[in-house]
Amino acid sequence: MMEVLVLGSGVVGLTSAWYLAQAGHDVTVVDRQPRGAEETSFANAGQISYGYSSPWAAPGIPQKALKWMLEKHAPLKIQPSLDPALLSWMGKMLLNCQLSRYQVNKSRMLAIANYSRECLKALNQTYSLDYQGRQRGTLQVFRDEKQLTAIEKDMQLLAQSGVRFELLNVAQCLTHEPGLAPVQEKLVGGLWLPDDETGDYYLFCQQLTELAKQQGVRFHFDCHIQQLVCEGKKIIGVQTDLGLLKADAYVVALGSYSTSLLKPLGIEIPVYPVKGYSLTLPIIDEKFAPQSTVMDETYKVALTRFSDRIRVAGTAELAGFDPAIPEARKATIEMVARDLFPHGGDFAKGQFWTGFRPMTPDGTPIIGATPYTNLYTNTGHGTLGWTMACGSASILADVLTHGESPLSRLGLDLFRYPKAS
């Protein structure tokens, strides 16, 4: 057994703490917020999207990005900047848009997602967490025939990875999401992913925090992390505003903030904050609300059903750590909701939110060892934090405890990047 400090209490940090504790370690979680999941894990889409696990870096994206620059409601926005971190990240992302790299990255992401599904299933079977979860799948809807044609290659990868799916015509889409009936003329078909789930991300994190406490995990909230202190290639502590915290091993699970903490150690990880937005609406008419998750392929916006709310989330904006919510981004999110489910939610009572998704240029998280003998990472999950959280945490616990995991062959640690250390 080792004493382990987990830095970060979003869904990835919390699940890391849980699986490390289950492996027999003495775990403490450190976070600057007063409770877990107060930042990127707070109000995102609420999807557990095993079948939709796919990198943003894909064939055709460079051309689409140029087109999107001129569109009002584009799914990707780039704020002009000479930030070296942004330029470097974008360059790496462009390289990963090659078909061969996309296929490798998507296969790797699907493997993590499928493993994570089994981990979450086992967790729920044992502890019966209640987070307004629904196991009713994801419906990816298409607005033009080109999207239907383009999805064929993804379907091949889904089949190879053992992910269940079904290509649907519009009438079949309505059997899963009858609330789309008033706008069916806008659609040409859809892809049904029956094993996907939804739920209140924040509620899941709060319940897991309490469960972890019962298992002996300690939490230092309202504790600001300043730097990692090392001697040679070993970490000897974490300097915080509460003093120097020491352990046998350290896990960096700080999402987009992992990069700045690791950089003084000479560790360069390509994790960039890709800003996302959400709108939460009270449901006013259930028959016109989504039943599970509807993913609008045109605008890359997800509409997810909770018990009495609709969560509309999407867009990707490269703007650093700017916390502002521009009216233009609000307009895009609201437009998609009004376009697909105009009568389902109370737009007058809608609440907007933004968060910083920790995105890698290849879409795959960075899980595992570092050049420092007792330092580990679990970050870079992008839009798939909850989807991959339990599996990633289990992988991390295996690597920290045994030196490898069943998925080590995938090359998930930072050493897959030539200049990571």
From Swiss-Prot:
Residues annotated to bind FAD: 4-18
Pfam families tied to this protein: DAO
Catalyzed chemical reaction(s): a D-alpha-amino acid + A + H2O = a 2-oxocarboxylate + AH2 + NH4(+)
Domain of life: Bacteria
Record GO terms (molecular function): D-amino-acid dehydrogenase activity
Keyword flag Transit peptide: no
Gene3D superfamilies tied to this protein: D-Amino Acid Oxidase, subunit A, domain 2, FAD/NAD(P)-binding domain
Keywords: FAD, Flavoprotein, Oxidoreductase
InterPro entries attached to this UniProt entry: DadA (IPR023080), FAD-dep_OxRdtase (IPR006076), FAD/NAD-bd_sf (IPR036188)
One term under GO cellular component: plasma membrane
Swiss-Prot/TrEMBL GO biological process terms: D-alanine catabolic process
Enzyme Commission identifier(s): 1.4.99.-
Cofactor requirement: FAD
Pathway entry: Amino-acid degradation; D-alanine degradation; NH(3) and pyruvate from D-alanine: step 1/1
The keyword Oxidoreductase appears for this protein: yes
Class in the EC hierarchy, top level: oxidoreductase
Function: Oxidative deamination of D-amino acids.
Similarity section: Belongs to the DadA oxidoreductase family.
HAMAP family linked: DadA
Protein name: D-amino acid dehydrogenase
Organism: Vibrio cholerae serotype O1 (strain ATCC 39541 / Classical Ogawa 395 / O395)
Gene giving rise to this polypeptide: dadA
